[in-house]
Amino acid sequence: SRGFEKYVEADTKELAELKISGVTMELPLGASSYGDSPITREKSFEQIADTVKSTKASVGDVYVYQNQGSPQVLAGASGMKNISMETSLFPYITDSVPFTAIVYHGSMDLFSQTLNTLGDSDVRKLKMVEWGVYPSFDLTYEDPDKLLYSGNWYLVSSRYSDWKDEILETYSFVEGALKYVTGETITDHRVLATGVVEVTYSNQVSIVVNYTDHAYENGSLHVAPGSYEVIKQ
């Protein structure tokens, strides 16, 4: 709606003055009118998509959250954040498939849920390699206790100086695999054995991820436990 556009215009001007090169936009619900006359959901999506495009032109990269990534919005966005890499957790589900990555990898940047608000960091690093998703952190310069009564009250640990080493280590681990498949699409995803998956990309590069606590051997291929191997054809 026009109300949303006005809010964004004011913020965009301030961000441009601060020389910010990229933003993440949390978009309103498709039918929200912000005090304007009621409009249809389709028209609202149209206006929001236009706002994303204009913000990108003024500020730089614009990212949206996965659960707000409608086709109209994604057409103007640089990428998606908060990519969920979990199954629905129903008891009859045994494996997860990187559906979002299969659809979008190669056409836009994909980022994980914020790692400093989640557990199981070792497993999540492997998941990011399997899914072709880069790490994301929710960070502050100062101690987050100052945000206790704000919209960011959930940040228990976010100070950059506390997380710097973990950020560098995580990025290095993930980038070690994904640097070979930048801009490529996923063409195949298969389970080689329990806890071992292979993802193949359009440039014929395959990444084998081993989630188990023992080495995976197949001919000349050796994948250490809790690690991955990149196979270049």
Each language-model region and where it sits:
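Active-site-proximal substrate-binding groove within the catalytic cores of carbohydrate-active enzymes
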Residues: S1-Q233
